[in-house]
Amino acid sequence: MKFLDLCKVYIRSGAGGGGCVSFRREKYIEYGGPDGGDGGTGGSVWAEAVDGLNTLIDFRYQQHFFAKNGQPGMGRQRTGKDGDDIVLRVPVGTEILDEDQETVICDLTEVGQRVQLARGGNGGFGNLHFKSSTNQAPRRSNPGQDGVERTLWLRLKLIADVGLLGLPNAGKSTFLAATSNARPKIADYPFTTLHPNLGVVGVDNTEFVVADIPGLIEGASEGRGLGDLFLGHIERCAVLLHLFDGTSETLIEDYHTIIGELEAYGVGLADKPRITVLNKIDALDEERRAMALKQLNNVCGGGVMAMSGVAGDGVTDVLRKLRGEISDEPLRHKPVEEKEPWRP
């Protein structure tokens, strides 16, 4: 399934049905009076977060969503049928933005959460409403209220517990593949990952979700490389895992590049809890590994961990560190299977 995290939609709620001008006409009733019914209410446009979706690709092929109009009123005080609502089903974590792409209308973060995007127009009054002591036979009714037209943007921000950070080829996808059932594309060239990937990672009978985003480069906040569009997918993460390529000759510059892009993006991303890890230690000898760890500890203030996503060295320690940083609320505890004792 193709990944799409930003799309534009056009919506219109249904117009209300017009009121009816009608008079009671029955045998032996000479002056029946007005009996025109009201028009039906137009359909509304809703958005609902549903489970099982992780992309907005469906909205690439259909961008226009129009609710049904209400039916006009009828004689014998019959109200017209209401127009059918239309529901936009979106993934959990979808933000709905106004046409300016800045004003947030709603953030759908829970399954089943709904929001009304455009309310249907009210139906018009039939002539029964205009009867008075001075006007016993009104020939007047109201038209239905027009529907509402809007242009909106949908932006998907994946919901994960841990977000992976790093320059291209830092080993983020390798780490995700080694610790979960996710199978992102892995190759020895930059920007192998072109869209975010999610994986469920388990350690010590608990599970949490890890998000892998495309690598950042200097100037990403200005649109270089793949830009910073994908940083929105780690806004909701409880902790960030910053991976460094241990074979890089410019570790300090690499650190400042990523931190600079986080600060340029804003929304407090640079202030999130962050675990720094030196990756690919299987490709380093003892002396070079010690030197790289010393450099990173000096610039980060200590606490740098080391691992190899390919060989698996230190991966469990990193997962346990991540688990400790995540609050207990989002952690999913796996049931421990108790085996019955063997009986002859």
UniProtKB/Swiss-Prot annotation:
Residues at which Mg(2+) binds: S173, T193
Gene Ontology CC terms: cytoplasm
GO MF term (any one): magnesium ion binding
Coiled-coil positions: none
Region (Disordered) location: 126-146
Gene3D superfamilies (UniProt xref): GTP1/OBG domain, P-loop containing nucleotide triphosphate hydrolases
Name this protein carries in UniProt: GTPase Obg
Organism, scientific name: Roseobacter denitrificans (strain ATCC 33942 / OCh 114) (Erythrobacter sp. (strain OCh 114))
